[in-house]
Amino acid sequence: MVKIFIDPGHGGSDPGATGNGLQEKTLTLQIALALRTILTNEYEGVSLLLSRTSDQYVSLNDRTNAANNWGADFFLSIHVNSGGGTGFESYIYPDVGAPTTTYQSTIHSEVIQAVDFADRGKKTANFHVLRESAMPALLTENGFIDTVSDANKLKTSSFIQSLARGHANGLEQAFNLKKTSSSGLYKVQIGAFKVKANADSLASNAEAKGFDSIVLLKDGLYKVQIGAFSSKDNADTLAARAKNAGFDAIVILES
């Protein structure tokens, strides 16, 4: 059993960075909760604990103490940047060596593959959560809240889902996580494109009509997915609703 501690940065009276009508504390929680859902629904042999699951203040000491007392195998702190830049970067504590450096490289690479963010590189910093955690720790900075282009991406649920998916893919690779040994998931797909911009456009259209969407890169195509279910009946119901809304929806069983 791999024990992963997920830390959505800031919260409560501490909003974190702000800009373009967004607050960092809200975005970090959205990414963390989406990541928890993916890991819980799609993987086995993984145990999760979050530093917070709502808009509450948690001190830095309480965050690392919770992870240390729980005996986590990995500490993942999720943040959003500010300062006028653009793109994604990740941090580990200086001079920690393997396996932390390996985990950083793997997760960083998977996030970059999953989202349309510039790669600002793998970095080190003397952050509290990296220094005081008793296990390998990584802090990710997911775009710049005060840069309009980054903020516009962070405002869409499909982009938040893609960020969560990138983190999940990285954790799968880093810790050799196994997919749940079920009969698979029935996924509702409304499009597949060679050009990511076309997939993003369809995803935005779906969101405007009330569907949660995510863009996934698989087999060389950017696929727009609006749901995944263990029950085919639930998938069929969503597909029918999507068709009524004008989308060319199909249900795909993936093991």
Curated annotation (Swiss-Prot):
Keyword presence, Cell wall biogenesis/degradation: yes
Noted pH dependence of activity: Optimum pH is 8.5-9.5.
EC number: 3.5.1.28
Pfam families, alphabetized: Amidase_3, SPOR
Outcome of mutating residue 10 to Q: 23% of wild-type activity
Positions annotated as active site in the UniProt record: 141
PANTHER family for this protein: N-ACETYLMURAMOYL-L-ALANINE AMIDASE, N-ACETYLMURAMOYL-L-ALANINE AMIDASE AMIC
Domain observations: Contains an N-terminal catalytic domain and two C-terminal tandem repeat sequences that play an important role in peptidoglycan binding.
Protein name: Sporulation-specific N-acetylmuramoyl-L-alanine amidase
Organism of derivation: Bacillus subtilis (strain 168)
